[in-house]
Amino acid sequence: MEVTVTRLYALIYDYVDDDVLERRAPHRELHIRMVRERLADGRLIMAGALGDDPPHGGLLVFADAGEAEEFAEADPYVTSGLVRAWRVDPWQTVS
């Protein structure tokens, strides 16, 4: 059986606290626009919230670590202080 290993990069956000839904509202439109632009051009593979309401974080999967870091540094969720911590972790998928 042949196995294909693909290296991707997970950008993981830890949100600040339980009122994140209210606090993110003014920044959500730009955040979603940034996500959609990168999904459309292939730089971003998938993205979504982690946890139930309210979410406790986010997960964005990129093909390039540099793209993940650049996204986080420009993301209004990060620059406005909604994200307590973020990191980019290598993720090896097997298919």
Which residues does each PLM region occupy?
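Conserved, structured core segments of small domains
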Residues: 1-95
